[in-house]
């Protein structure tokens, strides 16, 4: 009975906490890469393998990855040293999307990414669930290398506010339209900066698609109204339906006194 109980506990631990398998050997990694790229040499996905930093160094030096434009490394037990190996790779110059979800990357690793020419063509950077703080976010915001970024995912990290503010006001990341910061301990000013950024991007999207007159349907609220009045193309509005937005007196007064809404018909 005692042995059975021990076996049950071991079984439960392995499947509830996740088994940690031995690191993959260099030969095994190379074979795995070739297998994964056999049908599509542009996308390399490695999920829940014990690659480790040493294994990532093997990947980075493999000629097989020269064609890769999308690299996904999910739960592969890598840290900042692994990121350094990627950054120094002569074979990853074509990377456009880098997914590093659920690993052990800190601000140091982010600083390496933000300063490496290897990542100068990145359009998507996903750092979901790592150990990144405001300093890492600031490194991205001030990067002279990541200027092509369109989408940035920093969900489930440790960003508290200053990093969020710098990201949403970055003068370097002119192409960045999507910033994900959910499940970070962000303080009020940081949350407001992020919300403002999201609203501005939604307004830009409506304007690009000639649907700016539908802006009120998004239930933007009083804060959204104040942001809308700062939108460069707000003067093009012809109709503005803000029913069900539960506006404050401040927002209503701002709307009524705005010189930018002279084109409104209804």
Label each residue range with its predicted role:
Residues 5-15:
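Sec-dependent N-terminal signal peptides
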Residues 21-87, 101, 208-239, 246:
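LRR N-terminal entry segment and analogous cap-like coil->beta motifs
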Residues 49, 76, 103, 127-130, ...:
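Consensus "Asn ladder" position of solenoid repeat domains
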Residues 70, 85, 90, 96-97, ...:
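A detector of tandem-repeat and repeat-rich interaction/domain scaffolds
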Residues 117-183, 187:
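A charged, solvent-exposed segment within the mature domains of Sec-exported extracytoplasmic proteins
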């Amino acid at each position: 009975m005692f042995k059975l109980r021990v076996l049950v506990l071991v079984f439960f631990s392995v499947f509830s906490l996740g088994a940690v398998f031995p690191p993959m050997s260099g030969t095994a990694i190379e074979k795995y890469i070739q297998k994964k790229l056999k049908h599509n040499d542009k996308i390399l996905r490695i999920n829940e393998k014990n690659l480790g930093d040493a294994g990532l160094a093997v990947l980075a030096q493999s000629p097989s990855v020269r064609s890769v434009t999308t690299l996904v490394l999910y739960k592969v037990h890598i840290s900042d040293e692994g990121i350094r190996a990627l950054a120094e790779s002569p074979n990853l110059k074509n990377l456009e999307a880098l997914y590093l979800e659920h690993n052990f990357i800190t601000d140091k690793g982010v600083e390496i990414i933000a300063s490496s020419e290897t990542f100068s063509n990145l359009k998507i950077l996903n750092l979901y669930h790592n150990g990144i703080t405001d300093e890492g976010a600031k490194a991205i915001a001030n990067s002279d290398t990541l200027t092509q970024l369109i989408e940035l995912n920093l969900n489930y990290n440790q960003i508290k506010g200053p990093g969020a503010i710098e990201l949403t006001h970055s003068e370097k990341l002119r192409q960045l339209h999507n910033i994900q910061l959910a499940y970070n301990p962000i303080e009020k000013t940081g949350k407001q900066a992020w919300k403002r950024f999201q609203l501005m991007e939604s307004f830009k999207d409506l304007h690009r698609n000639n649907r700016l007159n539908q802006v009120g349907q998004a239930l933007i609220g009083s804060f959204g109204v104040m942001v809308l009045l700062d939108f460069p193309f707000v003067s093009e509005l012809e109709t503005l339906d803000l029913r069900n937005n539960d506006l404050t007196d401040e927002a209503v007064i701002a709307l009524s006194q705005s010189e930018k809404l002279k084109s409104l018909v209804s």
